[in-house]
Amino acid sequence: MASLSPPESTHALNLEELRKPNITFWSVWDQDELMGCGALKELDGQHAEIKSMRTSTRHLRKGVAKRLLEHMLEEAKRRGYVRLSLETGSMEAFEPAKRLYAGLGFIECGPFANYVEDPYSVFMTKEL
């Protein structure tokens, strides 16, 4: 997805960032094949951010991202978060992701945490 946005508008976490203690990372496998992944980043005791949601091209439109996101929503509730937010791209390639998030109750919002307005970004949030 980095190829769709200029460097200053790319907010994906690298491997070192995924290892930080405020990040929980999940992956979905079918035997030895990676189907998808996603992360939850704690922003504070009540607010977390969905990060690094990806689905393998081979497994697109099979419900992998939805199942993973539903798991992350349940985990966020279990941890006591009252709000989840996310940043995704504004380009057409991100429309399926935006539909998925909207279908699970996320609504568009302004920038949160350290984000700023960006024509390449769409911000969404959900009260839990």
What annotation goes with each model-predicted range?
Residues 1-47, 51, 56, 69-70, ...:
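Acetyl-CoA-dependent GNAT
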Residues 55, 61-78, 99-103:
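Conserved acetyl-CoA-binding loop-helix of GNAT-fold acetyltransferases
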Residues 56, 89-91:
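Residue-level recognition of the GNAT/N-acetyltransferase active site
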Residues 66, 91-110, 117-119:
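Conserved active-site alpha-helix within GNAT-family acetyltransferase domains
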Residues 76-89:
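Conserved GNAT acetyl-CoA-binding A-motif
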Residues 88, 113-114, 118-128:
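Terminal substrate-recognition subdomain of acyl/acetyltransferases
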